Regions:
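Extracellular TM2-ECL1-early TM3 structural module of rhodopsin-like
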Residues: 18-33, 56-118, 170-173
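Internal alpha-helical transmembrane segments of multi-pass membrane proteins, especially GPCRs
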Residues: 62-65, 108, 141-145, 174, ...
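Extracellular N-terminal segment of 7TM GPCRs
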Residues: 1-40, 254-258, 299, 306
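Class A GPCR helix-loop hinge within the 7TM core
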Residues: 108-143
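Extracellular-loop-to-transmembrane junctions of the mid-late helices
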Residues: 150-193, 260
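Helix-to-loop junction signature of class
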Residues: 29-33, 70-89, 104, 108-112, ...
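Intracellular effector-coupling site of seven-transmembrane GPCRs
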Residues: 193-237
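Seventh transmembrane helix
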Residues: 236-239, 258-306
Length: 306
C-alpha cells in the first residue's frame, strides 16, 4: 500500500494541516455535493416534463442523470472521511461504516459503467442507424440492469475484502481503478470511431431522426471528452499511488492531501458537466429548461371581482 492510505483502509490523520484548511475543503466539497444533487435533479425534472425527450435513445442519458445525482451522496461521504482525517470526528471501523464506504464507491462506479454503455449505444446508433431505431425498450432496461448488477458485484467484493482480508485491499484498489481505466478505454475507442465516421461524412443526412441522433451523439461526445479530462487525472494518480511508486513516497503528507483533494474535486465535477452541456447543446432540453423556470417565475394571475 502507498504511504497515504485511504481512510476506510486505515484510520489516519494529517496533524500538520490547520483546522481552517480542513474546514475550507469541507466547505468546497459540501458546496459541490449540493450543486451535483440540485443540477441533476433539475435535469431529471426537465426530462420528465419534456415529452420530446422521452425517446429510447435518451433512456441511458436520463439514467446517467439519476446516477450522477447519487454521486452527490459519495461527495457527502467524502466529506465525512475528510472530517475524520482532520480529527473533527472519529470514524470507527465497523460493518456499518464499511457498508457506507461500499456505497461511496458504488455510485461513481455506476456512473463510469453507464458512460461506457452510452458510448457503445452511440456507436451502434452511428454505424447502424436504422437497426438502432428498431431496438426495443427492454434492451435499454436490460442495459441499466447490467449497470447496477456490475456495480453491486464490485461493491459487494469491496465490502467482503474489507471485512475478511483488509490487508489485501490495496490489490482491490488497483483492480478498481484499472476497471475505471478499462471503461475509459471503451469510451475513447467508441467515440474515436464515431468521430472518424462523422468526419468521413458517409452517414445519411436526409432522415430527420438520423440528424437528431447525430446532434445527440455530438453532444454526448463533448460531455464524454470533458468527463475524461476531469476524471482521468485522479484515476491515474490513484493507480500509480497504489503501485507504491517512489515518487509518491517523496511527497509530503500536506502536499499529498491538497493534491488528492484537488483531483477529487475535479473528478466529482464530472457529475456537473452533463446538465450544463445538455442546456447548451440539446435544443429540446434548453426549451424545457426555460419553460420550467418561466412557470416558476410567472406571477399568479389575479382576476378582479365584478
Amino acid at each position: 500500500m502507498a504511504n497515504h492510505p485511504e481512510p476506510e483502509n486505515a484510520i489516519s490523520s494529517f496533524p500538520m494541516l490547520s483546522a481552517s484548511e480542513c474546514f475550507a475543503w469541507l466547505t468546497v466539497f459540501g458546496m459541490e455535493a449540493v450543486a451535483i444533487v440540485t443540477l441533476n435533479a433539475l435535469t431529471i425534472i426537465v426530462y420528465l416534463k419534456e415529452r420530446s425527450l422521452h425517446r429510447r435513445s435518451m433512456y441511458l442519458v436520463i439514467h446517467l442523470a439519476i446516477v450522477d445525482m447519487f454521486v452527490g451522496a459519495s461527495v457527502i461521504i467524502e466529506s465525512w472521511k475528510l472530517g475524520n482525517i482532520c480529527d473533527f470526528w472519529m470514524i470507527h471501523r465497523n460493518p456499518f461504516s464499511l457498508l457506507i464506504f461500499a456505497l461511496y464507491r458504488a455510485f461513481p462506479t455506476a456512473s463510469a459503467i453507464n458512460l461506457g454503455a452510452i458510448s457503445l449505444e452511440r456507436t451502434h446508433a452511428t454505424f447502424r442507424p436504422f437497426q438502432h431505431c428498431l431496438i426495443k425498450k427492454k434492451i435499454f432496461g436490460a442495459t441499466i440492469a447490467i449497470v447496477w448488477i456490475t456495480t453491486g458485484l464490485i461493491s459487494t467484493s469491496f465490502f467482503l475484502v474489507n471485512v475478511l482480508h483488509s490487508q489485501a485491499l490495496h490489490i482491490f484498489d488497483i483492480s478498481w481503478f484499472s476497471f475505471f481505466l478499462f471503461c475509459n478505454l471503451i469510451i475513447v475507442i467508441s467515440y474515436s470511431s464515431i468521430a472518424v465516421k462523422l468526419v468521413s461524412g458517409t452517414q445519411p443526412h436526409h432522415h430527420g431522426a438520423t440528424n437528431r441522433e447525430r446532434v445527440l451523439t455530438k453532444t454526448l461526445f463533448f460531455v464524454t471528452v470533458v468527463s475524461l479530462l476531469l476524471v482521468l487525472p485522479y484515476i491515474i494518480s490513484k493507480t500509480l499511488e497504489n503501485m507504491s511508486l517512489p515518487t509518491y513516497k517523496m511527497i509530503s503528507r500536506g502536499t499529498y492531501f491538497r493534491l488528492n483533494n484537488f483531483l477529487l474535486f475535479l473528478c466529482y465535477a464530472n457529475s456537473l458537466v452533463n446538465p450544463v452541456l445538455y442546456a447548451f447543446r440539446i435544443p429540446e432540453f434548453k426549451k424545457a429548461l426555460f419553460s420550467v423556470f418561466h412557470r416558476r417565475s410567472q406571477p399568479a394571475q389575479v382576476f378582479p371581482l365584478n
